[in-house]
Amino acid sequence: CSSDLNDFYVKQLEELLTNYGPVYLLWFDGAGVDSKVNGKQTPFDWERIFKKARELQPDVLLSGAAPDVRWGGNEMGRGRETEWCVQGVTASSRLFGGNDVGIRAKDRNLGSIDSLAGKKRLVWYPSRAGLPIRRGWFYHERDDKTIKSLDYLVDCYFSTVGQNSNVLPNLSPNKEGIIP
C-alpha cells in the first residue's frame, strides 16, 4: 500500500507542478498523517515527495508538515509571545517531514536555549499561523454569518506578524469560485 500511495502522490505532484505555471508554495497538511489523529501512521515517503517538488519547481516553499515553513501550533491566527525561527531538529536530512523532526508545534518555548539542547542540528524554520476567516477551512453557506470582523483580523495580523510568524488567512471560494 505505501508504495502505491507514494507513487500516486508523486504523479499528482507532477501534474500540479508542470501544468499550471510557477508554484511558490505547497502546503502539506499534517492533519491525519500520523498516529495521533487516526490511530495509524500514514507511510508517506516525504524525502521522495519533497525531492520531486524541488525538481519540478525549484523555488517552491514546502510548508506545513514540511521542511521550509512550520505550523505555528494553532489555527487561530495567533503567534507565540516569543517566536524563534531557528529551531533544533532531530532529522539528519534537510528534506524532513515536519511531523518527524522533534519539534512539538504547540510548545510555548520553541527556540529557547533549553529547547535547542541535544538536537542534531539547527535550521531556519519560520512559523506560519493559519487563520480561517470563517468557522472552518472550507466554504459552507451556513457559515456566511460567521466571517470574522476586520478588527479581529487586524488584531490577529499584529499578534502574529508582530511576534515573528507569518499569517495565512484562508479565503474559501463558494461553489461559483467567488470569495464572498
For the regions a language model picked out, list residue spans one by one:
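Mature catalytic domains of secreted/periplasmic carbohydrate-active enzymes
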Residues: 1-180
